[in-house]
Every structure is written in C-alpha cells, then in structure tokens.
C-alpha cells in the first residue's frame, strides 16, 4: 500500500505510526478504568479544560502541550477534591471547568499576535503529521509506566472501578488511587491531543472499551483487549487518512465506530438465524 511504501522515506509518517500505536495502548488501558468507573464525563471535562492551559502557553510563547498538561492535571485533581469534599456536585464542577477551560484557551489564543484559525484547528481536531520524536518519546515513557502499573496494581484499580466501598473495606487506599488515576487520565489525554484533537479525543478512551465490552464483561479481558482494538483502529484510520487524504482523527473514529456497529449487530443476526432454524 502507498502508506507503507512511503513509511521508510518520510520521518513524519514513522512518528505518526509510533504515536498511534503508543496512544492506542495508553488510551485502551486508561479508558477501561474511565468507562468502568463511569468517569467519561469527567474525562471530557479534563480534555476540554486542558485547552485553557494550552491557550495560555501559546500566548506566552511556551510549549502548549506543557501548559495543557499543567492545566489538565490541576483540573483533574480539583474535580476529585471537590467531589470528595462535597463542596460542589462533581457534575457541576466538571461543567464549570469544561466551559471555563475552553473560554480561557480561545481568549488567549486570539490575543496572540499572528494568530490564525489554523492554530486553533490543529489542537481541536488534531494534526498527527506534526507529532515530533519528542512526543513519541513522551508517549513511550507514559506507555511503559502505565503497563507497569497495570501489571502491579490491576486488582486494586479493578476494585476501585466497580465498587469504591468494597475497595475501602479491603484496605485499599481509595483516595490516593482516585487522585493518581485522575492525574493519569489527564496526562494520557494531553499527550494524545496532537493525534486526535480535543474534540475527538474522548472517543478514543471510550470506543475501544465499548467494542470489547460488547463481547466480554470481564474487566481483565477488557483491559487486555481494549488497547489492541485501539491500536488496530488507530493504525487503520491513519492508513485510510493517508491514502484517501482525509483527517486522521476523523478516520480513526469512523473506523472504531464502524467496528462497534458491526460488533453490536452480530448477536442480533445470530439470534435471527437461530430463530429461523
């Protein structure tokens, strides 16, 4: 195929492919916790809140991803703190941070001299061809840390995802794990922004998990298979986007959505075939 023949000639393609594989692994593992813990709305809030830090860093001439990282982690920890203390409803805190982050980001980006709409679009919808070797290294470090953590603390995190009270009764430090996982979700989101963009990124955390969950209810199975599905969807979408000249993020989400529809329809077809027999 054209993509694979060009892969050895263009460095940006190898960076994009490596980023797709690594982000698929991280989003698959972290997404399992997010979906099972019913934190999808929280993840969406963190994703959009990160745009505030991105805009401030862009205005100041600093690294936008570093700014987004700080803003996202602080937002995630703030939401967890507000929810655990009961100072404000968690969904209200998420809604506030979601809208404020987007507003702050748009404001500071527009104030930057020489600002163009293309600067905004690259972060909202992703621009995988701009992924650098440094981005790939950062994703590789995050992936290694997540895989090590998944091997060491799979059971405590699984208990936390399904029943926090049960986890507490087993002596698991639920508050520490909640804060750590919230920060991990934030870091995963920010390091994947260049690939999917802020608008589409939440789908990469949820769609692979939904696909595997349609076939299995086991947390362990979902945690093992969701990264494989995410990687396959990322690579297939990247290849399709290159060959058909369409946005990579949209191609990836379309591929995963089509897979989910097929997986959901298969049992219905089997039931109809069984009834007819």
Residue ranges and their predicted role:
Residues 246-277:
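Cytosolic-side transmembrane-helix boundaries in multi-pass membrane proteins
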Residues 16, 64-70, 91-95, 140, ...:
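Loop-to-transmembrane alpha-helix initiation sites
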């Amino acid at each position: 195929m054209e993509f694979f023949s060009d892969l050895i000639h263009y460095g940006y393609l190898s960076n994009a492919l490596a980023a797709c594989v690594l982000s698929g692994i991280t989003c698959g593992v972290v997404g399992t916790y997010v979906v099972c813990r019913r934190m999808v709305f929280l993840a969406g809030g963190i994703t959009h809140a990160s745009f505030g830090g991105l805009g401030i860093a862009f205005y100041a001439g600093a690294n936008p991803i570093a700014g987004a990282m700080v803003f996202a982690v602080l937002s995630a920890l703030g939401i967890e703190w507000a929810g655990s203390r009961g100072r404000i409803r968690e969904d209200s805190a998420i809604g506030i941070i979601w809208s404020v982050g987007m507003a702050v980001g748009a404001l500071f980006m527009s104030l930057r001299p020489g600002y163009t709409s293309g600067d905004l679009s690259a972060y909202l919808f992703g621009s995988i061809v701009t992924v650098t070797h440094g981005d790939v290294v950062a994703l590789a470090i995050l992936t290694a840390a997540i895989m090590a953590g998944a091997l060491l603390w799979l059971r405590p995190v699984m208990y936390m995802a399904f029943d926090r009270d049960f986890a507490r009764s087993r002596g698991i430090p639920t508050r520490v794990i909640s804060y750590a996982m919230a920060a991990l979700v934030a870091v995963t989101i920010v390091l994947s922004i260049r690939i999917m963009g802020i608008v589409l990124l939440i789908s990469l955390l949820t769609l692979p998990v939904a696909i595997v969950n349609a076939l299995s209810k086991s947390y362990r199975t979902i945690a093992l298979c969701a990264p494989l599905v995410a990687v396959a969807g990322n690579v297939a979408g990247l290849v399709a986007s290159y060959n058909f000249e369409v946005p990579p993020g949209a191609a990836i989400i379309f591929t995963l959505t089509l897979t989910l529809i097929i997986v959901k329809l298969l049992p219905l077809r089997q039931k109809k075939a069984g009834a007819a027999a």
